[in-house]
């Protein structure tokens, strides 16, 4: 590691510990030439995720797109930004664990739906109405019946 003071490229690690975020290592170093001390941070470089859209085009995975879609669906609902961020983190971890660099947009949509079903039923229905592009009221009614069964099952299991 190059010293920021004298540009010498040899240094010794004095201290090494995990940073607060848990994904970074903080290292205190001392330059072999001028003995200046400095801090470096090391983290894993994640492979960029590509989303394969329905028309076959590819674009980089965007947490912001998911956040905006969920936020619009969650307007005036008891869903915090933190709840949304946590859901997106779980979605991204799932994708990185189960897919190698590319994932279909449909998979992402289904993961979002799964998270929203657990988070807030109304937000789920709002998101589904856009995501699934319902063709008629019957399709919406089927979704509502499905959600009603799920909610009742959850309430029964809590008793």
From Swiss-Prot:
Family, as annotated: Belongs to the NrdR family.
PROSITE patterns: ATP_CONE
Function of the molecule: Negatively regulates transcription of bacterial ribonucleotide reductase nrd genes and operons by binding to NrdR-boxes.
Tree of life domain: Bacteria
Keyword Methyltransferase: no
Zinc fingers classed as unnamed: ranges: 3-34
Annotated Pfam families: ATP-cone, Zn_ribbon_NrdR
Gene Ontology terms describing biological process: negative regulation of DNA-templated transcription
Manner of cofactor binding, per the entry note: Binds 1 zinc ion.
Protein name: Transcriptional repressor NrdR
Protein keywords: ATP-binding, DNA-binding, Metal-binding, Nucleotide-binding, Repressor, Transcription, Transcription regulation, Zinc, Zinc-finger
HAMAP family linked to this entry: NrdR
Molecular function terms from GO: ATP binding; DNA binding; zinc ion binding
Reported cofactor(s): Zn(2+)
Region (Disordered): 1-21
Stored InterPro entries: ATP-cone_dom, NrdR-like_N, RNR_NrdR-like
Residues of the ATP-cone domain: 49-139
């Amino acid at each position: 590691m190059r010293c920021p003071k004298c540009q010498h490229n040899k240094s010794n690690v004095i201290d090494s510990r995990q940073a607060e975020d848990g994904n970074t290592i903080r290292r205190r170093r001392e330059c072999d030439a001028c003995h200046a001390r400095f801090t470096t941070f090391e983290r894993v470089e994640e492979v960029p995720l590509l989303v394969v859209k329905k028309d076959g085009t590819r674009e980089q995975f965007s947490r912001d797109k998911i956040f905006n879609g969920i936020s619009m669906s969650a307007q005036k609902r008891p869903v915090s930004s933190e709840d949304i961020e946590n859901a997106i983190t779980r979605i991204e971890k799932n994708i990185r664990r189960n897919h190698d660099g590319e994932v279909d947009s449909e998979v992402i949509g289904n993961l979002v739906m799964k998270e929203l079903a657990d988070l807030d039923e109304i937000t789920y229905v709002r998101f589904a109405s856009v995501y699934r592009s319902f063709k008629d009221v019957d399709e919406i009614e089927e979704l509502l019946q499905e959600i009603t069964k799920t909610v009742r099952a959850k309430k029964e299991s809590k008793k």
